[in-house]
Regions:
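Generic early N-terminus positional signal peaking at residue ~5-7
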Residues: 6-7, 28
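Expand to "…catalyze enediolate/carbanion chemistry for C-C bond making/breaking, isomerization
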Residues: 17-362
Length: 362
């Protein structure tokens, strides 16, 4: 990415530790551009989202060479309180000088009830904002949390001369309050790109009897203990055109458990999952990428439907012995988009003269 020349700085904003800064009329006007209606944000690939401790130079360097769709440089749980300031500087330096390729580059800040969140945003965005694609906001319990970040980002963008609204937001839903307000959270800012399920804090919030992050409670006999929050977050995300990303599976050496976990949420419709270790990347990438045959089928449906509706004027047709119609096209669009994002190349072309494509459904 080509670096842009930053505009002059207009000074620092004050803060009250542990509280969300009150939004004044002046602040609202200053960030108005970031809240005006815009076209839907570009959807970024997020099959694998790698957590990278911001206080570890070794991990910051290693992450650059891994085959993940997104890296989020963590200033929250992975960084001890005494290391927060140094981690901000390390993250900004890694963003400026690192070779991240086509990865989505995100930074997870501390939550808005801490005394660190404000400085996380201001320091990192002022030093390396042109290299940040999104901010991950943890422990989002109300839409006001997202609004606060939107306003602050707008102020820093304006002060630094960055395009208004360029930096996106990923909101982590991590407790009962956040899940109860998830519809309002999903609508809180046009910067929002994804809702992320945070299983560890969510399990603690509900009092689940398990110490394994992302794993089913051992004595729970009702099926999938996470199905409701997963589905609730997914519906809220899709209603607002957002992506849905699952949190991590902490047992990094349990490949079978990770595969089952990832396959389940991928089948539900999630776009990706957090990974904590390089050894988890290949499994999660595979589970969130369509199989070649499924991708080919999706592209074939799209091509056949386009032909039959535009050339022959049909509303439905038969393809490989199955009826395809507008509903089929919508499903195929999803699978095809995921296959393209995963870098798949179609191996089968639609030809209307083939017998498999002939005939109107009875």
């Amino acid at each position: 990415m080509t670096a842009r020349t930053a505009g002059g700085r207009t000074g620092r904003w004050g803060r009250t530790p542990g509280k969300i800064p009150r939004v004044t009329a002046h602040a609202s006007r200053a960030s108005r551009a970031s809240r005006e209606p815009r076209e839907p944000r570009e959807s970024r690939a997020r099959r694998t989202c790698l957590a990278v401790p911001g206080s570890s130079p070794r991990f910051l360097a290693k992450a650059q060479g891994l085959a993940v769709d997104e890296v989020f440089l963590d200033l929250e749980d992975a960084v001890a309180p005494a290391q927060k300031a140094d981690a901000r500087a390390a993250v900004a330096a890694a963003l400026r000088s690192g070779d991240w390729g086509a990865k989505v580059r995100a930074v997870r800040i501390n939550d808005v009830t801490t005394g660190w969140a404000y400085r996380d945003v201001v320091d990192v965005i002022e030093q390396a904002g042109e290299f940040v694609d999104a901010i991950v906001l943890p422990k989002v319990a109300s839409p006001e949390h997202v609004t606060w970040l939107d306003l602050l980002l707008g102020q820093v963008e304006q002060a630094m001369g960055y395009p208004a609204g360029r930096i996106g937001i990923e909101a982590q839903i991590e407790d009962a309050a956040g899940l109860a307000a998830v519809d309002e959270i999903a609508a809180a800012s046009p910067r929002l790109e994804a809702l992320v399920f945070g299983p560890a804090d969510f399990m603690a919030s509900l009092g689940m009897r398990s110490l394994e992050i992302g794993a089913q409670p051992e004595r729970y006999l009702g099926g999938d203990a996470f199905h409701y929050p997963h589905l609730r977050i997914l519906v809220a995300a899709r209603a607002r055109g957002l992506q849905a990303v699952d949190g991590p599976y902490a047992a990094i050496h349990d490949a079978d458990g990770l595969r089952r976990n990832a396959a389940s949420v991928a089948a539900l419709g999630y776009d990706g999952k957090w990974v904590l270790h390089p050894g988890q990347v290949e499994i999660v990438n595979a589970e969130f990428s369509p199989a070649q045959a499924d991708y080919d089928r999706a592209e074939l449906i799209l091509a056949a439907y386009e032909y039959y509706t535009t050339v022959q004027g049909r509303g439905a047709a038969m393809l490989d012995g199955a009826m395809i119609d507008e509903a089929s096209r919508k499903l195929a669009l999803v699978a095809a988009a995921r296959g393209r994002a995963a870098g798949l190349i179609r191996t089968r072309e639609f030809r209307p003269e083939e017998p498999l494509a002939a005939g109107r459904p009875d």
